[in-house]
Curated annotation (Swiss-Prot):
EC number: 2.3.2.6
Coiled-coil parts of chain: none
Main EC class the enzyme belongs to: transferase
Predominant cellular place of this UniProt entry's protein: cytoplasm
Keyword Transcription regulation: no
Pfam families the record matches: Leu_Phe_trans (PF03588)
Gene Ontology BP annotations: protein catabolic process
UniProt signal peptide: none
Keywords: Acyltransferase, Cytoplasm, Transferase
Protein name: Leucyl/phenylalanyl-tRNA--protein transferase
UniProt record similarity statement: Belongs to the L/F-transferase family.
UniProt function note: Functions in the N-end rule pathway of protein degradation where it conjugates Leu, Phe and, less efficiently, Met from aminoacyl-tRNAs to the N-termini of proteins containing an N-terminal arginine or lysine.
The encoding gene: aat
Species classification: Bacteria, Pseudomonadati, Pseudomonadota, Betaproteobacteria, Nitrosomonadales
Amino acid sequence: MKEPFTNASYFPPVETALVDPNGLLAIGGDLSQERLLDAYRHGIFPWFNPREPIQWWSPDPRMVLPPAEIRVTRSLAKRLRNAGFELRVDSAFIEVMRACGAPREGAWGTWISAPMIAAYGRLFDAGYAHSIETWRDGRLVGGLYGVAIGRMFYGESMFSREPDASKVALVRLARQLERWGFGLIDCQMETPHLASMGARPIPRADFTARLAELVNLPHLPGPWTFDS
């Protein structure tokens, strides 16, 4: 049986996180399954560059997307219907992580290092981490990955090798999570891309209060299968 959310944690209270840089809460520790799950249950996530110590964050405000509020433009709706994409779930988790971590034009390095891939691979094996994948003609062309606890989904990263391929994955995820009774998708930090799809910032205090409810709802362990 899953242990209930409590105030006991490896981490200091999120209210003590720095204002500048926004949300930096702690440095150090490890990427064990126990510590990662504890972090997520308290609204904390790891984010650090290679060769840096592990850094743990809880920014204020927090970017969230209620699944029922996913925004689908007319052009994206057309892509969902007619682009010839195939959706798969939890079939290529490590491949999705590696694609998300691949160097991108205009970006220096990547925070999705080999230790991160190994750590989240263990979460996947334990049924907590998930990949939502967009395929075309047997090729992985986009997708995202994240962590689910109770009825809370924490989005981590997404990638596209074709236009809108990651958006298609996010829309399908949001629609399925709504059917399953998930309350929020955590988007961590504000970006124009996520805002265009309905995500919005909320105060950290509101986020952690809602989080405390959602992580204690019945857990759906992976691998997942979406409704057709």
